[in-house]
UniProtKB/Swiss-Prot annotation:
Residues 1-23 are annotated as: Disordered. PANTHER family: 30S RIBOSOMAL PROTEIN S12 FAMILY MEMBER. This is Small ribosomal subunit protein uS12. Belongs to the universal ribosomal protein uS12 family. One of its GO terms (biological process) is cytoplasmic translation. The gene is RpS23. Component of the 40S small ribosomal subunit.
Length: 143
């Protein structure tokens, strides 16, 4: 049975198109409201949090490495996430109970590369850019 044809089939076409849209992954994501329910950031691009602990995440096969990450509890809703710390030696600038700014990490909410389950990265530590600390342009504020 093909699609209905004829003069009075417009309503049928419109209704069928409306139903079929839900099969499109991007349409469903945009219209179900899961962006606010499932996303720890609640639809925002960045979020602040407190560092709970430093963790090493093992890279997926065929790579062999321990990727340096931190467990962060978000201030806005108390959710706990794992965030990647980019660049070599940057973990030394982060201590437990520091306030960090966390951003998304590529791929529309999916894990990136060989780091399983890590969807966020650290951008700032104690209100100072992690890149500036790494390049030694700025120092950590004395507490």
């Amino acid at each position: 049975m093909g699609k209905p044809r004829g003069l009075r089939t417009a309503r049928k076409h419109v209704n069928h198109r409306r139903d079929q849209r839900w099969a499109d992954k991007d349409y469903k994501k945009a219209h179900l409201g899961t962006r606010w329910k499932a996303n720890p950031f609640g639809g925002a691009s960045h979020a602040k949090g407190i560092v709970l602990e430093k963790v090493g995440v093992e890279a997926k096969q065929p790579n062999s490495a321990i990727r340096k990450c931190v467990r962060v509890q978000l201030i806005k809703n108390g959710k706990k996430i794992t965030a990647f710390v980019p660049r070599d030696g940057s973990l030394n600038y982060i201590e437990e109970n520091d306030e960090v700014l966390v951003a998304g990490f590529g791929r529309k909410g999916h894990a990136v590369g060989d780091i399983p389950g890590v969807r966020f990265k650290v951008v700032k530590v104690a209100n100072v850019s992690l890149l500036a600390l790494y390049k030694e342009k700025k120092e950590r504020p004395r507490s």
